[in-house]
């Protein structure tokens, strides 16, 4: 015969520890119900004693008429404060009981969940074992069905051994089935116990909730009474503080009047400052416009001088043209003309130095005024940018006359440049 197989103990919790924890939980629950089983809470007797000891404390809904004395008001306040303290202590006791009951509920649910888990795991293990035993039994039946060769009897035959093993496996299956049945019954009992405990806990929570609602109602009533008492005290204090309040109001009005006057003065100062700034800006604008007018006048005077110089240059060139028309005239007149031309050239250079910032534009306009190469130029005519006559045009003039004409032409070109620069500056001034 094979030895009786035993199931391995569950690693999480053995049966003895489960029973011990369940017994401890039952004891705690029983002690809690013994402490809190009476329908009337512990604070109710106190409330009855307080209400019975002072029946005249709460009259007409818990507050006195406006004509009551101050001593009655303060006596009612002391009674309401003691009642409020009792209610607070009852509320604290109920909160502690609710916390302990919730802890017990959580512990019981954890125990039940652990028991259910262990029972499920054991059930799976037993089912696995039953399946394994069934497979081994099936194998043994197949082996017994196969014909065996006859062997000499040497002790018990193989058929007897197989029969013994089959009987042993059948007994193991029966024992495992009984264990499974016991576990199922145990699980059913635990689930039933769990449901009963949950129902009791729900009932207890409902009772606690009802007690809390009653306490809340009492607190609301007490708050209303305290509010009425506070209103009465405020009315009395207002009656006592009316003269002082009038003085305070007068002082506040005086302070407000001073603040208004100070703000008005600050606004006036700000307006004066803004007016001064505006006047200063207007003065600056007037000075700027005056400077601009002076600059324009100076520019116009300079343009007039340039026009006068140009007119003088034209007169000089006309005299030179006349002298070229008569090449055999005296050299003294040419020298005088050359001197006057050189003086004009020096004046033009001085004007160029004074208006040097505007010279690039004048050079561009002078380049634009130069004659195009190949264009016919009439003899005896003069243009800005022309360096003088050539000896081929006037073969009758000597080298000195030609040089003098070239110098005069250079002076005329410089005068044209200065004139155009002045015109450009005048144009810029007009645009601005």
Curated annotation (Swiss-Prot):
Keywords assigned: Coiled coil
Sequence segments annotated as region (Disordered): 1-77, 349-411
InterPro entries the UniProt entry points to: GOLGA6L (IPR026737), GOLGA_cons_dom (IPR043976)
Start-end of Polar residues biased regions: 51-62
Pro residues: compositionally biased ranges: 1-11
Biased composition (Basic and acidic residues): 349-362
Listed Low complexity bias regions: 366-381
Coiled-coil intervals, chain numbering: 157-354
PANTHER family in UniProt: GOLGIN SUBFAMILY A MEMBER 6-LIKE PROTEIN 10-RELATED, TRICHOHYALIN-RELATED
Family: Belongs to the GOLGA6 family.
Protein name: Golgin subfamily A member 6-like protein 9
